[in-house]
């Protein structure tokens, strides 16, 4: 299988499978002199790791990251400094139960990558889905933690704004609520609504989808390039690469098609600090493929988990009609744990464009 690497200057290669011995990533192109600690990476992995609530898979993984190369430990024994050589990060798998998948060795799960992987490669890893599993995203989160260190002052954070048919009230948006509930939602009043809905669907043996919003702040104007190197193009590409993501929008996205020109235009005035002041942000912080200095806003849709207990019609590898039931431990709403993954992918795209801009232009205009 090819295509396990993304990025241009800040390049990340992920490796490993859901039920393999370990998974991880190699980061190439990280500048020397970047400092971080293990806890800087671990805090994001802890946000993504399974088994933290009944609304995620009950697979128990510590997701403790190990750094194998690319850094020097400082005298305090805690701080790492990058050397400019490839950074290798490893996360060991501890709680695989491959026997749970014995019934689908020769069956294709509807909505899963079983069939398409098999038809392309002539072989597939049925144990937890292999590379098609959400487990693969742990390595991305680790890479995203390093990426955050490259742009000075950058803040990248995400939240669940919809689960199934239920959507938050944006007037109640409070970032401080996101880490106080198992759904990473900024609307405290929706916690019980989400809980009741997922409980009902999961009790019936099914799963639900979600919409996640990512906001990046303190991004300098000028990142990205016209036509084939647009910043929003790369953000969309990386978000779409996340397993189970079926749609991405930047700024107002598809809603912009329902606006008039005067409604959609982000008007400008000169601020008291001598910098441009935007009166709105319909563009989501990116115009013409280049960052405007406003917050960058992206949303992505995560489909319901394909592995469910309700029988679904499918076929087996011999072409026979079958009814598939997937046992094992699966997320009733995988969109919840997609929040730190989306953050990581946006952070990696921003770090890559930051280095590309610095290499071509050399400095930033604020």
Swiss-Prot record:
Keywords: Amino-acid biosynthesis, Aromatic amino acid biosynthesis, FAD, Flavoprotein, FMN, Lyase, NADP. Its EC number is 4.2.3.5. Pathway: Metabolic intermediate biosynthesis; chorismate biosynthesis; chorismate from D-erythrose 4-phosphate and phosphoenolpyruvate: step 7/7. Its cofactor is FMNH2. CDD domains: Chorismate_synthase (cd07304). This is Chorismate synthase. It catalyses: 5-O-(1-carboxyvinyl)-3-phosphoshikimate = chorismate + phosphate. Homotetramer. FMN binds at residues 131-133, 243-244, 288, 303-307, 329. It holds the Pfam family Chorismate_synt. Gene3D superfamilies: Chorismate synthase AroC. GO terms for biological process: amino acid biosynthetic process; aromatic amino acid family biosynthetic process; chorismate biosynthetic process. The lineage of its organism: Bacteria, Pseudomonadati, Pseudomonadota, Alphaproteobacteria, Hyphomicrobiales. Reduced FMN (FMNH(2)). One of its GO terms (molecular function) is chorismate synthase activity. Belongs to the chorismate synthase family. It comes from the Bacteria. It is an enzyme of class 4 (lyase).
């Amino acid at each position: 299988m090819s295509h396990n690497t993304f990025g241009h200057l800040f390049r990340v290669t992920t490796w490993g499978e859901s039920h393999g011995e370990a998974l991880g990533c190699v980061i190439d192109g990280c500048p020397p002199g970047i400092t971080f600690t293990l806890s800087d990476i671990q805090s994001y992995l802890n946000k993504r790791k399974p088994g933290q609530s009944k609304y995620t898979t009950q697979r128990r993984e510590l997701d403790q990251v190990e750094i194998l190369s690319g850094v020097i430990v400082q005298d305090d024994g805690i701080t790492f400094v990058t050397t400019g050589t490839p950074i290798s990060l490893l996360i060991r798998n501890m709680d695989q139960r491959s026997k749970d998948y014995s019934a689908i060795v020769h069956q294709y799960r509807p909505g899963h990558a079983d069939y398409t992987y098999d038809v392309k490669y002539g072989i597939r890893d049925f144990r937890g889905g292999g590379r098609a599993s959400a487990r693969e995203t742990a390595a991305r989160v680790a890479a995203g933690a390093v990426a955050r260190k490259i742009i000075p002052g950058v803040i990248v954070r995400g939240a669940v704004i919809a689960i199934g048919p239920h959507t938050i009230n944006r007037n109640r948006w409070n970032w401080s609520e996101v880490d106080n509930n198992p759904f990473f939602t900024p609307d405290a009043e929706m916690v019980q609504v989400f809980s009741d809905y997922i409980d009902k669907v999961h009790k019936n043996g099914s799963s639900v989808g979600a919409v996640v919003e990512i906001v990046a702040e303190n991004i300098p104007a000028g990142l990205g390039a016209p036509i084939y190197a647009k910043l929003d193009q790369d953000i969309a590409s990386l978000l779409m690469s996340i397993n189970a993501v079926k749609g991405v929008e930047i700024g107002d996205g598809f809603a912009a098609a329902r606006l008039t020109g005067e409604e959609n235009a982000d008007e400008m005035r000169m601020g008291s600090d001598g910098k441009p002041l935007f009166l709105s942000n319909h563009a989501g912080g990116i115009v013409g493929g280049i960052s405007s200095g406003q917050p960058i806003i992206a949303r992505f849709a995560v489909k319901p988990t394909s592995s469910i207990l309700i029988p679904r019609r499918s076929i087996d590898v011999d072409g026979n009609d079958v009814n598939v039931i997937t046992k094992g431990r699966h997320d009733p709403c995988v969109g919840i744990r997609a929040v730190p993954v989306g953050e990581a992918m946006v952070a990696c795209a921003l770090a890559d464009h930051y280095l590309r801009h610095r290499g071509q232009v050399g400095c930033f205009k604020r």
